[in-house]
Amino acid sequence: MHFIFIILSLSFVVNADVFPSSVTLSSNDFDTIIKWDNNVISYDVELMQYSHDEWRTVCTNSLGYCNLTNSDIDNDDETWVRFKYENKTSNEHNIGRVCEIVQITSPIVNMTRDGSIILLDIHHPMTYDNQYYIYNNITLCGFEFIYEATFIINDTIIPYSIDNQYCDDVHCLFYFISQEPVCVYVMGMEQYYEFGPKKTDNSTRVCVDGLIPRKIDTYFIKDFDDIDRVNNRLYRVVSDKYESNISSKFMHLYNNILSSFKLILQELMVNTEQ
C-alpha cells in the first residue's frame, strides 16, 4: 500500500512540474528569444498575438529557449505563449511586447575635420544581423531617436541634442566649426514612445585633432561640395519643419530658388578661380 502511495505521489509531482513556471522575453537589437526555467523537458512552443487571435507553433522540440527572430511576429503587439508536451498543454503566459523590452546597441559614430569645419556622422543602430536600421522603421517599433551628443573641447564637457532634422533613414550629418581638438560620444533617446523612454547604449568616443596652425575663417562655402551641403541643409530644415503647412506650389518655388542659389555660387566660384 505504501509503495502504491509513493508511486502516485511521484506521478503527481511530475505532472505538476512538467511545464515551466517562469517565462521571460528578451530582445537585443531584435534578436528575440523566449526563455523558461525548465531545462529538462523539450516542448513545442505556441504563440498568439492580440491582433491575430490564433495560436501558431513557433518552435518544436525546444529545450530551454525558443528563438522568435524569424517567426514573423508583430513587435508592437501583446503576446502570449504556451507549451505542449506529449498530449498536454500548459497555461498561457503573457510575455508583453518586444517594443517594451528590446535593448538597442549604440549608434556608429565618425567625426572628420576639413579645415575648421567638423562633420559628425551618426549611423543609426542596426538589427542584430546588420540588415535594417532601427530608426523610423514601423516594423521595428518606429523609434525616432534624438541623439544626445557629449562633446569634450579643451576638457570642457558640452552636451548637445542633435535634432532629427539633420537625419535621414540611414544617418545624421551634423556640421559645426571649431579649431580646437574635439571628442564626442553619442546616445540615442526616444522620449515619446508610448511605453516610456527608450535609450541606446553610448557610442564609442571619437576625436579629431585641433587645427594647426590656427586661422581666421570669414566664410563657410569654400568649394563645390560645400554648395550641396548648404543646399541640402536648407532644404531639410524647410521640408521637415514647414512642408505640412505650405502648398506644393510654394515648395516648387522654393526648390527653384535653391537651384538658382547653387548656380550663382558655382558661377562666383568659377570666376574666383580664374
Curated annotation (Swiss-Prot):
* One Pfam family this sequence matches: IFNGR1_D2
**Molecular-function GO term, any one:** cytokine receptor activity
Which residues, if any, are the signal sequence? none
* GO terms for biological process, alphabetical: type II interferon-mediated signaling pathway
Q: Where are the transmembrane segments?
A: none
Family per similarity comment: Belongs to the type II cytokine receptor family.
Q: Would you tell me the protein name for this molecule? A: Uncharacterized protein C6
